[in-house]
Amino acid sequence: MWTHPIAYDVIVVGAGHAGCEAAYCSAKMGVSVLMLTSNLDTIAKLSCNPAVGGIGKGHIVREIDALGGIMAEVTDQSGIQFRILNQTKGPAVRAPRAQVDKQLYHIHMKRLLENTPGLHIMQATVESLLDKEGVISGVTTKEGWMFSGKTVVLSSGTFMRGLIHIGDRNFSGGRLGDPSSQGLSEDLKKRGFPISRLKTGTPPRLLASSINFSCMEEQPGDLGVGFVHRTEPFQPPLPQLSCFITHTMEKTKAIISANLHRSALYGGCIEGVGPRYCPSIEDKIVKFSDKERHHVFLEPEGLHTQEIYANGLSTSMPFDVQYDMIRSVLGLENAIITRPAYAIEYDYIHGNVIHPTLESKLIEGLFLCGQINGTTGYEEAAAQGLIAGINAVNKVFNRPPFIPSRQESYIGVMLDDLTTQILDEPYRMFTGRAEHRLLLRQDNACARLSHYGYELGLLSEERYELVKKQNQLLEEEKVRLQKTFRQYGQSVVSLAKALSRPEVSYDMLREAFPNDIRDLGAVLNASLEMEIKYSGYIDRQKILIQSLEKAESLLIPEDLDYKQITALSLEAQEKLAKFTPRTLGSASRISGIASADIQVLMIALKKHAHH
């Protein structure tokens, strides 16, 4: 076996969305990085939908940007439609989403990585890990090469023993057209990693020229919406396209119902559990049998292709059923399928062997990120890649780990959830997973997290100073409006009080009091309005967080023997030993741990501290 002459600080295995963030941020932080991928032409490939963001997910992309990651930048460069979802709802659940050109997304990401100093990219398929007495030392590849590394970041996506299903036919693959990885999964099993199966799926792609868009609802984008933090409204660099909405018909339901036994999902071919919030069309027909129709969103895959992503028609039906099903949908009567829908099963590792830093508990220096940890979605994967890359570098330099808390970020919510829960389905981020979501809005991600990005060396001083200046300006304006009183309606009130009324907007106040209300630009105007309008709720959540911080920050020693704490319930002893939470707050969120057990543990920790 040939040994590569260069020893790297960080080796990243896989070049999906997790791997790209891990490789970029590691190199940006000043270490030598090698990224290995089985195909250089599929770097950052959007394997499923041609979109980034959405509810919860868009918040994560903004947080990645605030910390100095690259998903937001590449999305803005590649976007062919930008929207804000939930505009009629409260600010906590409003979220940016972009349709992107799949080819351009790959091209922009590959170019960015290739031009990152300290980052080497190479085509090779990793088959096994190398370690010395439980400490990672490198990897070996199918090609017969060995690479040495102080740390390894594993981001294998759906490739570990990936199995593709189309009806009763199944075959090995990491995604349609790409081989799966067999050796790596076997190597991890031999090392004692608990591994189970999950499933995901993707709908068929259709030829645009064969679709009758005239009978569908057109869905254009919104102006001025991007992902990278800016002071002024975003101007997309690419031409913008519309999506279209149609729906299934009674005939669609009949076709699917008559062929359920031929679905890989319902025919018993699939053992892995699929994502609850992204069900297949056959799942929707069965679970929502009272509904006569289901929405289908037709999303363009790019500017230079006619392929259309049929969002809402994910299925594992055989191709002949897919053909009939597609042609039963309104406007798709003559649709031509360019790529079939399929389901894919893959291996993932249980969260109880992963630290919140995303370092493995079984092999020191091995970090895991993305779908290997049981998540689904590009955004969740990218965020994990960022955290894994940061902490791999911290490991190399013997620095303290970086773990954003669930009180300050959706990324922190995800890290905590993944390492304190046993997943029975792929994990997807929603705003409802956060206890303090009004504080974790998509518009204030930079205010919350940019100081970390700057301290880590991922954000430039210029960018950080801009964020600080904006934060200071918002705070000064908020105080000024609280102290400025004017006649408004029947009474004299502060302008902040006037703005807090539901029917009053910042623009309305600017028109009424042009000498008192400053125009800070559309982006800051909107943020200031939300901060003032919801200040009562925000202040209450901040007080609640302060009261919880003591429990959240109370560290649990790694060598604590839970069996010796006899007042703990047997279930609590077993689950605490299994997950080994870092803090009392994390312990409290493990399923099956009662509040009485937390009280007992708190007393035990205080006694332990005295000793």
UniProtKB/Swiss-Prot annotation:
GO molecular function, one term: flavin adenine dinucleotide binding
Cofactor(s) in the UniProt record: FAD
Pfam family, one: GIDA_C_1st
UniProt record, GO biological process: tRNA methylation; tRNA wobble uridine modification
Chief location: cytoplasm
Compartments it resides in: Cytoplasm
SMART domains per record: GIDA_assoc_3
SUPFAM superfamilies per UniProt: FAD/NAD(P)-binding domain (SSF51905)
Binding site for NAD(+): 274-288
PROSITE patterns listed in its UniProt record: GIDA_1 (PS01280), GIDA_2 (PS01281)
Keyword tags: Cytoplasm, FAD, Flavoprotein, NAD, tRNA processing
An example Gene Ontology CC term for this record: cytosol
Binding-site positions, FAD: 14-19, 126, 181, 371
Disulfide bonds: none
Protein family (similarity comment): Belongs to the MnmG family.
Subunit description: Homodimer. Heterotetramer of two MnmE and two MnmG subunits.
Role description: NAD-binding protein involved in the addition of a carboxymethylaminomethyl (cmnm) group at the wobble position (U34) of certain tRNAs, forming tRNA-cmnm(5)s(2)U34.
Name this polypeptide is given: tRNA uridine 5-carboxymethylaminomethyl modification enzyme MnmG
Organism: Chlamydia pneumoniae (Chlamydophila pneumoniae)
Top-level taxonomy: Bacteria, Pseudomonadati, Chlamydiota, Chlamydiia, Chlamydiales
